Every structure is written in C-alpha cells, then in structure tokens.
C-alpha cells in the first residue's frame, strides 16, 4: 500500500474510486453525485489548498481516503486539525487501510506541530468500533472524537 496526496497527477484514479464508492454504498456518500470538472478545478484552486486528501493506493487504484484541514486559534495559538472524511472501499476494510491513513495523517500533524484533532464520528456500529480502538483518544456521548497529540 502506498499513499499519495490528491493532486492533478492522480485525480483520475480518485474519480474512479468515487464512482465505485457511490455504486457500492451510495448511502455512505454525502452527495448524490459529484462533479468531475468541479473536483479538477478545486484541486487547482488556491482556496482549497488548506484541504488535504491522502489517498491509499493498491494495485494502481485508490482503495481509501482521508481528508483533513489544519487550523489555528489566534487567541492562544493552539494548532488543530479536523478530519472531515474517511472512507475505505468495502472489499478493503479490516485490512489496516484506515489505520494506515490515520497514521499518515498523524505524521503530517506531528510535522506541523498540531496539538490535537477532531472528527465527527459516523454512528454506524462498524465505524464506532474502529474509533473506539484509538489509543489516547476521547470519545463523548456525542459522535465526536478528540485526540491529543501532545502527550
């Protein structure tokens, strides 16, 4: 398994992955369709450069993705990250893809001195088991996960 940041050079593989994900699990997607030209434009648009998508690739295809943003609080300088999307194709689940995507993400967080990250958890039982396996993470009754990276 290799990891690549989403960019112009691998957008075709990413679009194939999105098509497959929408065919296999349309109820898991946040939209009923996606705009291929719009995605290509957003990758090139400086406004979207604060968004990072890391792709997990196997056999020359995308099998999973994590998307996140870094941000900072001006008042106290606390550096944070927000994970807004994690998805692994069904046939690649339970093989360490999501764990490795989070490992890549946490490596990027550490490189930028990120103090902690947040995500809104899926309430699906399978996803909940995955998030409960995180070490040093806080899970509230709300579907929010917070993990401190500066132990």
Regions found by a protein language model. Give the residues of each.
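A short beta-loop-alpha structural element at the N-terminal edge
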Residues: 1-16
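Conserved beta-strand-loop-alpha-helix junction that forms the acyl-donor binding cleft
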Residues: 117-128, 146
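Conserved GNAT acetyl-CoA-binding A-motif
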Residues: 102, 109-122
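Conserved beta-strand in the GNAT
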Residues: 53-55, 61-70, 82, 87
């Amino acid at each position: 398994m290799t990891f690549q940041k989403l960019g112009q050079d691998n957008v075709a593989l990413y679009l194939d992955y999105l098509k497959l994900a929408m065919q296999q699990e349309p109820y898991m997607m946040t939209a009923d369709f996606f705009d291929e030209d719009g995605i290509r434009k957003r990758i090139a648009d400086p406004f979207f450069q604060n968004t990072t998508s890391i792709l997990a690739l196997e056999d020359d295809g995308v099998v999973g993705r994590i998307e996140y943003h870094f941000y900072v609080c001006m008042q106290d300088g606390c550096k944070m990250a927000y994970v807004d999307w994690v998805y692994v194709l069904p046939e690649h689940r339970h093989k360490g893809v999501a764990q490795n995507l989070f490992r890549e993400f946490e490596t990027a967080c550490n490189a930028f001195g990120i103090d902690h990250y947040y995500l809104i958890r899926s309430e699906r039982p399978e996803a909940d088991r995955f998030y409960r396996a995180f070490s040093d993470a806080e899970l509230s009754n709300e579907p929010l996960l917070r993990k401190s990276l500066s132990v």
